[in-house]
Amino acid sequence: MTTRDALVSIRNLEIDGLTEETRVRIINDVSLDLKRGEVLGLIGESGAGKSTLGLAAMGFTRDGCEIVGGSVTFDGIDLVNATPETRRRLLGKRIAYVAQSAAASFNPAHKIINQHAEAPLFHGLSSRNDAETDAIDLYRRLRLPNPDEIGFRYPHQVSGGQLQRAMTAMAMSCRPDLIIFDEPTTALDVTTQIEVLVAIREIVEQFQTAAIYITHDLAV
C-alpha cells in the first residue's frame, strides 16, 4: 500500500511530554499507514504511549504533550496544522473515539438512544426519528439484546458489556471513516470481552471503517 492509498498516514511522528522542569520523548519516530476496512492493533504496557498515539491519529494531544515532529494526515488533511474548527468538524462525523469506560462516557441523566442521536443531529445528517431508527439497527448489528427497547434505558440500567456495545453504536452513528478504540474491553470479564470484540470486528467490516485498536492485553 502506498501513502496515497491510505486513509490515515503518520510519518516520523514525535511527541514530547512536558512539565515545568523536564521534556520527555513519549512517541519517537513512528510511521504507519491505515486504509479503509483495516484494523490496526497498538499493543504495549501501561505508559508506553499507545493512547497518546491514538489521540495523535485524530490530530489531538493530551494536556502536557506536544507534537514536535512528523506529520499526521487524514484523507489528505494535515491534522497537525489543522485549525481547531477543522478538527471539531471531523470529530464525531468522520473520526470517532471509543473510550475505555463506557459508564464514564455516557450522561447518566439521559437515555442511551437520546445520546446516540446527538451527533447525527448536530452534524445535520438525519432527523431524530431517522437517528433513532438507525440506532436500533446498529444495536441489532452489535448483538445487543432487545435492540428495539434497550436504547430507551438509562446507562445504569444495562450491563457493562451492553453499554460498551452501545457506545460503539454511538461512535458509528455518523458512519465515520476512522474509529479509535482505546482499550474498550479492559473493565469487562473475559467472556464479555470476546462478545464485544466479535461485535466490533463485524461492524467495522460491514461498514469498511478503518480502526485503531489500543490494548495492553496481547490475548485481545
Where are these regions (language model features)?
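Conserved ABC transporter NBD signature motif
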Residues: 66-78
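The feature captures the beta-strand-to-loop junction immediately N-terminal to the Walker
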Residues: 43-44
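Conserved ABC ATPase signature
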Residues: 153-158, 162
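Helical segment within the ABC ATPase nucleotide-binding domain
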Residues: 194-208
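Catalytic Walker B motif of ABC-type/P-loop ATPase nucleotide-binding domains
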Residues: 179-182
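A short, proline-enriched helix->beta-strand linker immediately N-terminal to the Walker B motif
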Residues: 173-177
